[in-house]
From Swiss-Prot:
Annotated family: Belongs to the universal ribosomal protein uL2 family.
Biological processes annotated in GO: cytoplasmic translation
Keywords, ordered alphabetically: Cytoplasm, Ribonucleoprotein, Ribosomal protein, RNA-binding, rRNA-binding
Tissue: In larvae tissues examined: gut, brain imaginal disk, salivary glands, fat body, muscles, epidermis and trachaea.
GO CC terms: cytoplasm; cytosolic large ribosomal subunit; cytosolic ribosome; nucleolus
InterPro entries recorded: NA-bd_OB-fold, Rib_uL2_dom2, Ribosomal_uL2, Ribosomal_uL2_arc_euk, Ribosomal_uL2_C, Ribosomal_uL2_CS, Ribosomal_uL2_dom3, Ribosomal_uL2_RNA-bd_dom
Compartments, record wording: Cytoplasm
Region of interest: Disordered: 208-230
Biological classification of the source: Eukaryota, Metazoa, Ecdysozoa, Arthropoda, Hexapoda
Gene source species: Drosophila melanogaster (Fruit fly)
Main location: cytoplasm
Record's protein name: Large ribosomal subunit protein uL2
Single GO term (MF): RNA binding
Amino acid sequence: MGRVIRAQRKGAGSVFKAHVKKRKGAAKLRSLDFAERSGYIRGVVKDIIHDPGRGAPLAVVHFRDPYRYKIRKELFIAPEGMHTGQFVYCGRKATLQIGNVMPLSQMPEGTIICNLEEKTGDRGRLARTSGNYATVIAHNQDTKKTRVKLPSGAKKVVPSANRAMVGIVAGGGRIDKPILKAGRAYHKYKVKRNSWPKVRGVAMNPVEHPHGGGNHQHIGKASTVKRGTSAGRKVGLIAARRTGRIRGGKGDSKDK
């Protein structure tokens, strides 16, 4: 019997526990309340902080609670251009400027947004990674829906009552800088999850992986496996319809 391979270790098992030991907290928009639905509420950016394991910086924003004598501290994903001391306005009657949070219905077409809600009141789900943004494409007044273009290029229709922050997420160009050495990759993934380094199966011993062993690094058998293969053997090209290079193309017909 071989060892438990990597695919089995990372697969289904006990309840997943996220790696959040040094994280600063969950970055979300304010809870949707009467103040935001009817008018606006003002906050002030107290600090811009780094969150380990996250590419984008976070903004610590203080709001005065509209219902009781208390200061509410919120963690927002910081857009490009936000600074400490800046006033942030959240609500239907907020102005269109970087860092403000508004419903999509109040934004003109072509507005660049980030931290967009997928469902009304979920406090931000889309376009949250460093340098990412979504674009408001069109509003439908009859159905109260808005069409947005996501960072992937896909178009999505969401309710016009969904909120979003105006601007581009800060930290753009982060992946342009090469990692260059293993030490930096080690520290990068140490705060994220146990996903590095990735050792190839052919570089292992036969007890550790189905592709391991041999006097030189080769798989030694067909790398295609069927869909119902047992967990420890299910590596390689799983339930592949075809393998190999795709040769030729549509314009290759000889009888032109």
